[in-house]
C-alpha cells in the first residue's frame, strides 16, 4: 500500500503543481487506487486491513518521498522538493487521494 501510495501521490502532486494532467498520469492514478483498494481489501472477512485513519497516516508517511520524485519529474525537474512543496497543498492532495481510494 505504501509503494502504491507514493505513485498515487506523485501524480496528484504533479497534476496540482502543473495544473494539467496526461493520459499516462490518469492511468497511473487509477492503477494505484485499484491496487491500494485490492491490497487493503479482506476477501473472506469482508472489510479492510487498514482503517481510514491508518491509511491516511500511511499516505502522510509516503508524501515526502512522492514529493521528492515529483520534483524530479514536474516542470522538467526545475524545482527542488522544498520549492515544489510551496506550489501544492499537502492536505488537499492527501484528501483527494483518500477520496479516490474510498470512492467518495
Model segments located where?
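Surface/interface-facing alpha-helical segments and adjacent flexible terminal/loop regions used
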Residues: 1-104
Amino acid at each position: 500500500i505504501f509503494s502504491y501510495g507514493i505513485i498515487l501521490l506523485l501524480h496528484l502532486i504533479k497534476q496540482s503543481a502543473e495544473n494539467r494532467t496526461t493520459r499516462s498520469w490518469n492511468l497511473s492514478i487509477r492503477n494505484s487506487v485499484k491496487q491500494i483498494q485490492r491490497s487493503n481489501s479482506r476477501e473472506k472477512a469482508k472489510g479492510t486491513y487498514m482503517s481510514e485513519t491508518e491509511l491516511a497516516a500511511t499516505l502522510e508517511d509516503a508524501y515526502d518521498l512522492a514529493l521528492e520524485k515529483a520534483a524530479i519529474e514536474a516542470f522538467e525537474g526545475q524545482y527542488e522538493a522544498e520549492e515544489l512543496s510551496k506550489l501544492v497543498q499537502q492536505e488537499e492532495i492527501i484528501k483527494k487521494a483518500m477520496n479516490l481510494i474510498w470512492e467518495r
